[in-house]
Amino acid sequence: MELSIATPQGAKGTVSVSEAAFGREFNQDLVHQAVVAFMAGARQGTKAQKNRAAVSGGGKKPWRQKGTGRARAGTIRSPLWRSGGVTFAAEPRDHSQKLNKKMYRAAIRCILSELARQERLVVVEEFDLDAPKTKDLVQKLAQFDLADVLIIGEDVSENLYLAARNLHKVDVRDVNGLDPVSLIRFDKVVVTVAALKKLEEVLV
């Protein structure tokens, strides 16, 4: 399978990639499962409240059962009392979902294959900046007619990372930092030839 290498002047040459990695049929259910699992794993789940067992206060009965004229009370930590525990207290929860590595890699292959079919995968020889300037990055992207884009490199340089940090429609990742949500979030995905070859090794 051949992918065109883009330059500011237009397509220039091609690069051979594996059909197994970039020519897969799109599996919507698998991609959906991978996206849901990734987003669930990103949830903090750190909510917490104190129930009647966790709030401070003694276990002593506040007053005797009968003869006072007041309502019966067994503890000052009752949810009915001020400063008592919460009736159905929220507890910390792990929202993560298990997804096999084989399925996860297959989902990434499906997304990359669909991007290639839709001509949203832009292959370049290299993509770097001489200085960490956002203006330079915007100008470089404009040469390729790109604005809403994910840039994938074999190793992300600090200059490129710092320049892209101030653009909310641009993100930079290395091959190991890829996830399904980032791949489907942007209009175009720019990948260097070196990163493409490394991706092929990881996915096949």
From Swiss-Prot:
<dbReference type="InterPro" id="IPR002136">
    <property type="entry name" value="Ribosomal_uL4"/>
</dbReference>
<keyword id="KW-0694">RNA-binding</keyword>
<comment type="similarity">
    <text>Belongs to the universal ribosomal protein uL4 family.</text>
</comment>
<protein>
    <recommendedName>
        <fullName>Large ribosomal subunit protein uL4</fullName>
    </recommendedName>
</protein>
<dbReference type="InterPro" id="IPR013005">
    <property type="entry name" value="Ribosomal_uL4-like"/>
</dbReference>
<dbReference type="Pfam" id="PF00573">
    <property type="entry name" value="Ribosomal_L4"/>
</dbReference>
<feature type="region of interest" description="Disordered">
    <location>
        <begin position="49"/>
        <end position="72"/>
    </location>
</feature>
<dbReference type="GO" id="GO:0003735">
    <property type="term" value="F:structural constituent of ribosome"/>
</dbReference>
<comment type="function">
    <text>One of the primary rRNA binding proteins, this protein initially binds near the 5'-end of the 23S rRNA. It is important during the early stages of 50S assembly. It makes multiple contacts with different domains of the 23S rRNA in the assembled 50S subunit and ribosome.</text>
</comment>
<comment type="subunit">
    <text>Part of the 50S ribosomal subunit.</text>
</comment>
<dbReference type="InterPro" id="IPR023574">
    <property type="entry name" value="Ribosomal_uL4_dom_sf"/>
</dbReference>
<dbReference type="GO" id="GO:0005840">
    <property type="term" value="C:ribosome"/>
</dbReference>
<keyword id="KW-0687">Ribonucleoprotein</keyword>
<dbReference type="GO" id="GO:1990904">
    <property type="term" value="C:ribonucleoprotein complex"/>
</dbReference>
<dbReference type="GO" id="GO:0019843">
    <property type="term" value="F:rRNA binding"/>
</dbReference>
<keyword id="KW-0689">Ribosomal protein</keyword>
<keyword id="KW-0699">rRNA-binding</keyword>
<comment type="function">
    <text>Forms part of the polypeptide exit tunnel.</text>
</comment>
<dbReference type="GO" id="GO:0006412">
    <property type="term" value="P:translation"/>
</dbReference>
